């Protein structure tokens, strides 16, 4: 099925599948966002990344292979030479997971604890950039007025300074980078890690902040569930002196992600503006009710 949203990646899908000997004629779109995800018959998932992301795609495949060798359950690349460059975009091929659902807070905590305990691999993962693509997203956020965009730019600059001066925390390690229940899922046979593109070396608090923000900022996680997360991991990151800096970076990313996509998806404009209004103190104190953006 081809729509106006899926059409830009269709040529890449066809070219990449031809390169590795797969048939894309009955491919079905699974998720159309910054990266496009397609399903092929036979349990193959095709991931079409943005142009210019070939190095990241190669690293993601290598990370998956390293996790498999380390005993961590995660998505697995299929046995073809990849990534494939097609129509200027890197394309990777993965084994489809069995039926699964979002992980619980305990699932997330236990997978993160297992990951954080691993020794660093013998290849370069790169160091965490907590503000990756924030500037690009702000530039694309055309539904916001100039005053709001200027304020967000200033917030970005202030948080970048605070990040460099953040207090010491836990020892740095391999981190997932986007550790929320949609990426750390549960199948009938156990917990599985997905979406490996943001894995890097950095402070483990960055992974823990994702769940904490869902309690303190968006209100998606009740305090009782957050307490189970802390018990399972062994630490409450909200008590760390650097929490507000990392939480602020997470909030900024969530706002700019929504604002960027509102420019091409008008139905998200109200939510993007709502998030900006919350940060600017126009919607009362945290937690706020932020709806998901796909």
Placement of each model-derived feature along the sequence:
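Regulatory N- and C-terminal appendages and interdomain linkers associated
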Residues: 1-24, 150, 274-294
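Conserved Hanks-type protein kinase catalytic core
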Residues: 95
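A short, glycine/Asx- and small/polar-enriched loop/turn
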Residues: 34, 40-43, 86-90, 249
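Active-site acidic catalytic loop and adjacent metal/ATP-binding pocket
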Residues: 31-46, 77, 160-208
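Active-site activation/catalytic loop segments of kinase-like enzymes and analogous catalytic loops
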Residues: 205-238, 249-266
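An alpha-helical support segment within catalytic cores of ATP-dependent transferases
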Residues: 6-13, 120-177, 234, 286, ...
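A conserved alpha-helical element in kinase catalytic cores
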Residues: 10, 47-87, 98-117
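ATP/Mg2+ or Mg2+-diphosphate-binding catalytic cores
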Residues: 133, 138-144, 224, 256-294
